[in-house]
Amino acid sequence: MRLTRAVTNPPWTVDVVVVGAGFAGLAAARELTRQGHEVLVFEGRDRVGGRSLTGRVAGVPADMGGSFIGPTQDAVLALATELGIPTTPTHRDGRNVIQWRGSARSYRGTIPKLSLTGLIDIGRLRWQFERIARGVPVAAPWDARRARELDDVSLGEWLRLVRATSSSRNLMAIMTRVTWGCEPDDVSMLHAARYVRAAGGLDRLLDVKNGAQQDRVPGGTQQIAQAAAAQLGARVLLNAAVRRIDRHGAGVTVTSDQGQAEAGFVIVAIPPAHRVAIEFDPPLPPEYQQLAHHWPQGRLSKAYAAYSTPFWRASGYSGQALSDEAPVFITFDVSPHADGPGILMGFVDARGFDSLPIEERRRDALRCFASLFGDEALDPLDYVDYRWGTEEFAPGGPTAAVPPGSWTKYGHWLREPVGPIHWASTETADEWTGYFDGAVRSGQRAAAEVAALL
């Protein structure tokens, strides 16, 4: 698909305006242009990709935002294939490491070595959690049996109610931090169950092999967004933050930093929490306004360290680790080649990390890498981190950390159109919520809604 028709100077008149040039917005724009509709995409940043951002460490592409793509993520895989962007398996050969209460030990597989009591308890919790998740309708979680009860408690409260051991609670805390960028007490049990159901289960969500972390894009996931935007050409306007959307009889007037556009419809493809940055006239119904305040982003950052070789492999380690010590709580080996450079990527608890100066962030992250893989990690060729909490647009973590009480009160309005205003973002997806695949699916769904009305 190659679109060549030029976009004129403002004010513009098009069929549809899309707000946001992340995976959701670009997917929506591509679907509509394929059908012959005139589309204009407004993006507030000076780049496309949304929560995908590819930087460099030691000259190697490094995903500062979302990194992984896995089986059953068919929408984003199809998009990458169409655009000619390859994936490569995430390195997983060797022993994993778990750092627990001040000591580190190795294990193989998904579940760390715990005591017999701990393993039995983890198995029990997985069974109970999966049973609850299977009973949650992803498209309408408020209709689940015991929906109100599940939504009124946090994941942390649920773990205490079912008398999880301290080891089990610690493992679930690590999972919660890397998944939503928050603590178990911050996220609704109903949201946690729905999220797992949308991924196809805990194994699919957490595993590398046959799971959500199975593959990555060697040149960075932002390539996918850049290639999609290149096809749309001048229809994508950067540095065009949308400030206001007016509804009227003919559709909408969308006011951005680059000018105004008249359209029959608008697709707002940004995280729900950041809808509040746009002024709507007439105002959105109260339920929509409340939803934006009850769908906060988590807090998650990333740290990379590059070495001459992936030295941990020589000791039989995979580079994957879990830790209950801040700031790095999970790591992956994202080295491009076995002969170097060796690159460790760590997910970081942003709450205490983001406010530190770079020297202290570097020191703390390298200290964590060294406690997992040895003192050689203290002397990298290069170190880079990215603090998502400092972003002007969509700051925070990879997805929403929805607190107790939110789904049953406000979930109905998450993607329900308001006249000509339609909604997209990975948070609104029924499959792979929180992932690029969910974002692509949400954009395609919003495009189908609008196309049916054009």
From Swiss-Prot:
Its cofactor is FAD. It comes from Mycobacterium tuberculosis (strain ATCC 25618 / H37Rv). Pfam families: Amino_oxidase. One of its GO terms (cellular component) is cytosol. InterPro entries: Amino_oxidase (IPR002937), FAD/NAD-bd_sf (IPR036188), Flavin_amine_oxidase (IPR001613), Flavin_MAO (IPR050703). The keyword Flavoprotein applies. This is Putative flavin-containing monoamine oxidase AofH. The lineage of its organism: Bacteria, Bacillati, Actinomycetota, Actinomycetes, Mycobacteriales. The keyword Oxidoreductase applies. Its EC number is 1.4.3.-. Keywords: FAD, Flavoprotein, Oxidoreductase. Belongs to the flavin monoamine oxidase family. GO terms for molecular function: oxidoreductase activity. Coiled coil: none annotated.
